[in-house]
């Protein structure tokens, strides 16, 4: 998917935490156990000691590129981080307009770009978790290394629009939050609320894809772009991940839906262009 070169990007919608490097003391399980034993022997509240120990100090690399440099669509066509800025801008522009037509005010949600680990409102965010939306602070968290992992670990073909699909999916969860339908139900299975919620986010991503060019940031997606998104959706299907990691499929453990389901609901969103039709 190509950005219009003269599109003006708003990098303020992306928080860049990639230049930060931890320099503090990491408390391992053994150290924690020692602290607990000593505090109990001394009759001291162990939480007072644990809270007093510095667990994270950070430094910033001033020479690192930041998203503040992302000004135009031309920048987005050249740099991956600027591409994410452009996707975030286009996604939020669409949802601002789409929800307003139905009488709902959309609240902007920043994306936090980080490397390896960072602190989120929902706890510690690590690259192993993959991209996610945190309803506690209303932010999307993304380590750009995930896109390489999408290909090497999950077998996706990758590409710029696979990235767009991932970002749009996470913003789908923010839209659910805005609409008051984001659930914390942890039950699993093909018909679980958890799976339906993920499939709805896929559908919302498809809806945005249908209207992406209307925002002024992007050119209309090509069939290659759509195929890339569908390929990425299938790559993170529960059945495919289970088959590749354990050699068997256990539907009762699904949390995100099968490859076929994820492709189906992205396609539903794209074909209808109507988010009110996203009802798995």
Predicted regions, residues:
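Long amphipathic alpha-helical segments used for membrane anchoring, targeting, substrate engagement
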Residues: 1-69
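Post-HExxH zinc-binding segment in Zn-dependent metallohydrolases
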Residues: 2-17, 191-217
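Active-site recognition of the HExxH zinc-binding catalytic motif
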Residues: 37, 95, 142, 165-178, ...
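Catalytic zinc-binding patch centered on the HExxH motif and its immediate surroundings
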Residues: 50-52, 117-143
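Short helix/loop segments within enzyme catalytic domains
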Residues: 82-88, 92-94, 98-100, 200-239
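Short pre-active-site segment immediately N-terminal to the catalytic Zn-binding motif
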Residues: 146-165, 189-195
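Post-HEXXH active-site segment of zinc metalloproteases
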Residues: 177-199
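Pan-zinc metallopeptidase signature
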Residues: 239-280
